[in-house]
Design a protein with these regions (language model features):
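Secretory targeting signals
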Residues: 1-4, 15-19
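N-terminal export leaders
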Residues: 6-10
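Short hydrophobic/aromatic segments of transmembrane alpha-helices and their interfaces
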Residues: 11, 16, 323-324
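N-terminal helix-turn-helix DNA-binding module of bacterial transcription factors
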Residues: 11-12, 27-29
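C-terminal motif of bacterial Sec signal peptides marking the signal peptidase cleavage site
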Residues: 22-25
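A residue-level marker of the well-folded mature domains of exported/periplasmic proteins
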Residues: 29-384
Length: 384
């Protein structure tokens, strides 16, 4: 039997304690708990995209009731459509000449990235300006010089002229129609001819007299020209000028007339037979959408009845049913491609075929028209 003394017991206890301490010291030292990760900072809001700045240049006042008014109505329509994505401005009554270059250059220099120059006479100024502003897109109405950062666009106004002619041919009592012409360029000559062709489709005895004012917007001259035509036997007047002066004159003289570019009914409600209008909104909407989506390209666009860019509206109550039916027939044909206004045989004043029987004039031919068709009196100014 083994006996342990008190001293021995104390010694064993001490050794035991040291061993325990040593074992504890050999264990892994406990690390402090990591600090919680800071919450992620809120993402900074993306900077607001600046609106596309768009400028319009008009040849007449926006209150002309016709051409410039139609463009400005389309400007307002795209403002409503695109909201804060765009910012528009306009300058009215810009003369076609040296001053036009200054005005359009200022538009480009002032941060506008899309510029609409809405008259034929702005073509050369735009050609001079465009190379200096490669990041600006220029759209020139009724012109033909496109490329680079310049596109051109037009409306087939001759289709509206033809539709008006249908009514005139059905309703004239004198068989003499009158046209107040603005500037003798192919666009206007084409409209005079198409008006006459439309009238002759209803009444082959029609003749058309023309008086030129050599300006787009010149109410006093337009009034004088309209009066001259009425005195010359015309009982229905048509115009390719920008103010309602022709319609007003017809109202005062007890004759009939058409509105042009915009609905002009209010300017001569008794004289008004209908208005051949241009709707620029579809094209302007397309261009803005293309620019916003980096899809814009330089090209020439020529829209008409098919694209809802041309129509005749607000027909007078006394327009006969046969004329209304003919108008609807022609519009349907223009939309589905089964009808062409300039399909031969079409003859000039001398009786020469300018479009052969069964042939359809192409757009290049249409853009270069500088002659009158059979039934139009006088000569095209400047034509050989």
């Amino acid at each position: 039997m083994i006996h342990l003394h008190k001293r021995s017991l104390l010694k064993v206890a001490a050794l035991s304690a040291l061993a325990s301490a040593a074992l504890v010291g050999c264990g892994k030292k406990e690390e402090p708990a990591p600090a919680p990760a800071p919450a992620p900072a809120a993402a900074a809001p993306a900077p607001a995209k600046e609106p596309l700045k768009i400028a319009f240049g008009y040849v007449g006042p926006v209150g002309d009731g016709g051409y410039s008014f139609a463009h400005d109505q389309a400007r307002k329509a795209i403002e409503k459509e695109f909201g804060d994505k765009i910012q528009t401005s306009f300058v009215e009554s810009i003369p076609e000449g040296a001053d036009a270059e200054r005005v359009f250059r200022d538009m480009a220099a002032n941060g506008n990235k899309l510029v609409f120059a809405t008259s034929f006479g702005y073509m050369e100024p735009i050609q001079r300006i465009a190379p200096d502003f490669p990041n600006v897109k220029f759209e020139h109405a009724t012109g033909y010089k496109n490329g680079g950062n310049v596109a051109t666009y037009d409306s087939r106004t001759y289709e509206g002229a033809y539709l008006a002619g249908i009514i005139a041919g059905a309703m004239t009592k004198s068989n003499v129609l009158g046209v107040v012409g603005s500037v003798p360029i192919p666009e206007v000559v084409r409209n005079i001819n198409s008006f006459t062709l439309g009238a002759q489709s209803m009444n082959p005895k029609i003749t058309t007299k023309v008086v030129w004012v050599n300006e787009w917007f010149a109410p006093p001259k337009e009034t004088e020209a309209a009066t001259s035509l009425i005195n010359g036997g015309a009982d229905i007047l048509f115009q390719n000028t920008d103010s309602p002066a022709v319609l007003k004159t017809a109202e005062e003289k007890g004759k009939r007339a058409f509105g042009w570019d915009s609905d002009m009914t209010a300017y001569g409600p008794k004289a008004h037979l209908g208005s051949a209008i241009i709707n620029w909104t579809p094209y302007y909407s397309k261009v803005v959408n293309d620019v916003l989506n980096d899809k814009w390209t330089s090209q020439h666009t020529w829209w008409g009845v098919k694209e809802n860019a041309i129509d005749i509206v607000s027909l007078a109550p006394d327009v006969p049913d046969n004329a209304k039916a003919k108008i609807e027939e022609v519009k349907k044909g223009l939309k589905d491609g089964t009808f062409s206004i300039w399909k031969g045989p079409i003859k000039d004043q001398a009786g020469k075929d300018v479009v052969a029987d069964g042939k359809v004039a192409d757009d290049d031919f249409m853009r270069g028209i500088n002659f009158y068709v059979k039934g139009v009196e006088g000569k095209v100014p400047g034509a050989q």
